[in-house]
């Protein structure tokens, strides 16, 4: 009888255990089996024994003398998933947890601290998960690092900061220099304004061709001559005109600002002379010099002027480099003079080449096209596209466009393409054939 009862109890225990493990889905095999087993009371595994057998001593009274009594550790729970190959162990709870549960009267689930897995795929996925988390944290840490500014930007900020701090002192220094040389600055501004006015007026008269005004040309000549004579007379004690003929002006010392003063006055005077010579060319009537040929003379005058302007400062720079003080180093002065001479020789060679090309162009005739027939003029509308008047000595270009000869020559003195089709009509662009004068300040 008692064997039958024990057999029933063991079968119930097996059915309870199999129901707890077989009902778990495959993807929730181990963790939920652990939670279901852990949610049972520590002594609840044997509650079925207590329910059916109210008094264990009565059931096993016949074997009390032959079977030793042993206490089952209520806190030890063994479990295994059905067919999963995983074994998990719940370690005994501490005394504090047991006491707390007893006092509270309710069981609070606590996650197990240690899990032992048997299966290569679970270990591999866990390592991959940990490695991925580690890489993710490292990438987030790299993204959070503040970017450093570029070196060029930091240097620019430093320069701007320095300028903000030093700008007041720079302005004070400039104000002091301007006050010391106020007379020279005023004279240079006046001469520059005179040059700009005369140059623009002359170009306007050149573009008018035969309709130019002789009175305006005479006014330009008188205006330039008056300014030149006034400046030279005002500073006659310095004998600034000597620099125009490669002589030394009358100055006790020659510092850097004195050098700029003498070179600047000489350069402006030579520009005035250049404009005056071009005014004489403009004033010549058509009988003496044709309008289409005047551009060549403008070019020759300008190239000769630039060559002469580049030669004037040489003796002044030699004087400034060597100096009047005997304590100066002759070796350093000699080296600087050699370097200056080399640089200046390249500049002069370029100027000489420009003069040679201008003279060659002056001696050769330039044909931009051939004479147009009456039929070609009729097909073109009998109106010049440049002057908007009837054709006078019409020329036809390779692009089959017809223009007046004078209009075409004046146009090609500034441009190198056809006014209508923009096809190339001349090989090279020739500057200074429109009567303009270079505003370049020849300081060296």
UniProtKB/Swiss-Prot annotation:
Residues 13-41, 92-149 are annotated as: Disordered. InterPro entries: RNFT1/2, Znf_RING, Znf_RING/FYVE/PHD, Znf_RING_CS. The chain crosses the membrane at residues 182-202, 215-235, 256-276, 330-350. Residues 107-121 have a biased composition (Basic residues). The lineage of its organism: Eukaryota, Metazoa, Chordata, Craniata, Vertebrata. This is RING finger and transmembrane domain-containing protein 2. One of its GO terms (cellular component) is membrane. PANTHER family: RING FINGER AND TRANSMEMBRANE DOMAIN-CONTAINING PROTEIN 2, UNCHARACTERIZED RING FINGER-CONTAINING PROTEIN. GO terms for biological process: positive regulation of ERAD pathway. It is found in: Membrane. PROSITE patterns: ZF_RING_1, ZF_RING_2. It comes from the Eukaryota. GO terms for molecular function: ubiquitin protein ligase activity; zinc ion binding. E3 ubiquitin-protein ligase that negatively regulates IL3-dependent cellular responses through IL3RA ubiquitination and degradation by the proteasome, having an anti-inflammatory effect. Residues 1-181, 236-255, 351-444 are extracellular. Residues 131-140 have a biased composition (Basic and acidic residues). Gene3D superfamilies: Zinc/RING finger domain, C3HC4 (zinc finger) (3.30.40.10).
């Amino acid at each position: 009888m008692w064997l039958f009862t024990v057999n029933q109890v063991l079968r119930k225990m097996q059915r309870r255990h199999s129901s707890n493990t077989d009902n778990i889905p495959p993807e929730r095999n181990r963790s939920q089996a652990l939670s279901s087993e852990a949610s049972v009371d520590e002594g609840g595994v044997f509650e079925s024994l207590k329910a059916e057998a109210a008094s264990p001593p009565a059931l096993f009274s016949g074997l009390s003398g032959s079977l030793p009594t042993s206490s089952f550790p209520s806190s030890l729970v063994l479990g295994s998933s059905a067919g999963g190959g995983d074994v998990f162990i719940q370690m005994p709870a501490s005394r504090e947890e047991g006491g707390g549960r007893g006092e509270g009267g309710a069981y609070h689930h606590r996650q197990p601290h240690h899990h032992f897995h048997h299966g290569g795929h679970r270990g591999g996925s866990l390592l991959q998960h940990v490695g991925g988390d580690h890489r993710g944290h490292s990438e987030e840490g790299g993204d959070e690092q503040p970017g450093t500014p570029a070196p060029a930007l930091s240097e620019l900020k430093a320069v701007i900061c320095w300028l903000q701090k030093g700008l007041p002192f720079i302005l004070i220094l400039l104000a002091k220099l301007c006050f010391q040389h106020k007379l020279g600055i005023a004279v240079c501004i006046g001469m520059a304004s005179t040059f700009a006015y005369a140059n623009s007026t002359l170009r306007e008269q050149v573009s008018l061709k035969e309709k130019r005004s002789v009175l305006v040309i005479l006014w330009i000549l008188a205006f330039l001559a008056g300014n030149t004579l006034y400046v030279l007379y005002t500073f006659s004690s310095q004998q600034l005109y000597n620099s125009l003929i490669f002589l030394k002006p009358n100055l006790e010392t020659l510092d850097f600002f004195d050098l700029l003063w003498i070179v600047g006055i000489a350069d402006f005077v030579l520009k005035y002379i250049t404009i005056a010579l071009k005014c004489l060319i403009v004033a010549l009537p058509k009988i003496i010099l044709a309008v289409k040929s005047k551009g060549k003379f403008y070019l020759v005058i300008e190239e000769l002027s630039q060559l002469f302007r580049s030669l004037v400062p040489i003796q002044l720079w030699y004087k400034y480099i060597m100096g009047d003080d005997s304590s100066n180093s002759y070796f350093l002065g000699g080296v600087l003079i050699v370097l200056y001479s080399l640089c200046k020789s390249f500049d002069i060679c370029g100027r000489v080449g420009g003069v040679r090309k201008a003279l060659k162009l002056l001696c050769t005739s330039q044909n931009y096209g051939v004479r147009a027939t009456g039929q070609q003029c009729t097909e073109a509308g009998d109106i010049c596209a440049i002057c908007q008047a009837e054709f006078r000595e019409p020329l036809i270009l390779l692009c089959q466009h017809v223009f007046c000869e004078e209009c075409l020559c004046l146009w090609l003195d500034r441009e190198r393409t056809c006014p209508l089709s923009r096809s190339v009509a001349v090989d090279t662009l020739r500057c200074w054939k429109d009567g303009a004068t270079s505003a370049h300040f020849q300081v060296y």
